[in-house]
Amino acid sequence: ADDKNPLEECFREADYEEFLEIAKVTVLEASERNDKEDWYANLGPMRLPEKLNEFVQETENGWYFIKYPVKPSEEGKSAGQLYEESLRKSAGQLYQESLGKAHDDIFAYEKRFDEIVDGMDKLPTSMYQAIQERINFKPPLPPKKYAMGAITTFTPYQFQHFSEALTAPVGR
């Protein structure tokens, strides 16, 4: 049986070195890798040209390399400026849409006005009827309280302010 690998034989061709010289490439082959490193896939030798230029992924004129067709109003602008303008336009549209949605939510209900028949005094009267158990007109005075050695009667309003004055810290 022939143990020769046809791929390996390709690299042993008499003209192989000459082809590398013509193409001006360097063949990088990994062997005897560190045990802690793993391969996801072995893609064989890499052929790299001898002369390489650094590829910068981001520059002010980054889109120049991509050669997007641009509108006349966009010509001469940097990638950053074009990006900001596109975001500003999108943000403006989003803002307008959200305002429209909020407007619709607020004003989507029935648009009508009602008039109070027989005068505006009906409004507080009807409110009073709905909450009258919570309103206390002419409440009884609180029981007599001792204040500074004498018995004094206070209205609720007077007592509230008097008790605050008694409990207020010095210098207040």
UniProtKB/Swiss-Prot annotation:
Transmembrane helix: present as a keyword of the record?
Answer: no
Q: Name one GO cellular component term.
A: extracellular region
Name the InterPro entries on file. Answer: FAD/NAD-bd_sf (IPR036188)
Question: What biological process terms from GO does the record include?
Answer: defense response to bacterium; killing of cells of another organism
| Entry EC no(s) | 1.4.3.2
In what way is its activity controlled?
Answer: Activity is increased by Mn(2+) ions. Inhibited by Zn(2+), Ni(2+), Co(2+), Cu(2+) and Al(3+). No significant activity change by Na(+), K(+), Ca(2+), Mg(2+) and Ba(2+) ions. Both isoform are completely inhibited by L-Cys and reduced glutathione. O-phenanthroline, beta-mercaptoethanol and PMSF completely inhibit the enzymatic activity of LAAOII, but have no activity on LAAOI. Iodoacetic acid inhibits the enzymatic activity of LAAOII by 46% but has no effect on the LAAOI activity.
Cofactor(s) recorded for this entry are: FAD
Summarize the PTM comment. N-glycosylated.
Reactions mediated catalytically? an L-alpha-amino acid + O2 + H2O = a 2-oxocarboxylate + H2O2 + NH4(+); L-leucine + O2 + H2O = 4-methyl-2-oxopentanoate + H2O2 + NH4(+); L-phenylalanine + O2 + H2O = 3-phenylpyruvate + H2O2 + NH4(+); L-tryptophan + O2 + H2O = indole-3-pyruvate + H2O2 + NH4(+)
Keyword terms, alphabetized? Antibiotic, Antimicrobial, Cytolysis, Disulfide bond, FAD, Flavoprotein, Glycoprotein, Hemolysis, Hemostasis impairing toxin, Oxidoreductase, Platelet aggregation inhibiting toxin, Secreted, Toxin
The UniProt entry, under Gene3D superfamilies, shows:
3.90.660.10, FAD/NAD(P)-binding domain, Guanine Nucleotide Dissociation Inhibitor, domain 1
Q: How does activity depend on pH?
A: Optimum pH is 7.8 (Cc-LAAOI) and 7 (Cc-LAAOII).
Cellular location(s): Secreted
Binding residue positions for substrate: 47, 103
Thermal dependence reads:
Optimum temperature is 50 (Cc-LAAOI) and 60 (Cc-LAAOII) degrees Celsius.
Tissue and organ distribution: Expressed by the venom gland.
Q: Which GO terms describe its molecular function?
A: L-phenylalaine oxidase activity; toxin activity
Q: Where does FAD bind?
A: 44-47
Family stated for the protein in its record: Belongs to the flavin monoamine oxidase family. FIG1 subfamily.
Function in brief: Catalyzes an oxidative deamination of predominantly hydrophobic and aromatic L-amino acids, thus producing hydrogen peroxide that may contribute to the diverse toxic effects of this enzyme. Shows high specificity for L-Arg, L-Met, L-Phe, L-Leu, L-Tyr, L-Ile and L-Trp, low specificity for L-Val, L-Ala, L-Asn, L-Gln, and no specificity for L-Pro, L-Ser, L-Thr, L-Cys, L-Gly and L-Asp. Exhibits diverse biological activities, such as hemorrhage, hemolysis, edema, antibacterial and antiparasitic activities, as well as regulation of platelet aggregation.
Provide the assembly information.
Heterodimer; non-covalently linked.
Q: What is this protein called?
A: L-amino acid oxidase
Species name for this entry?
Cerastes cerastes
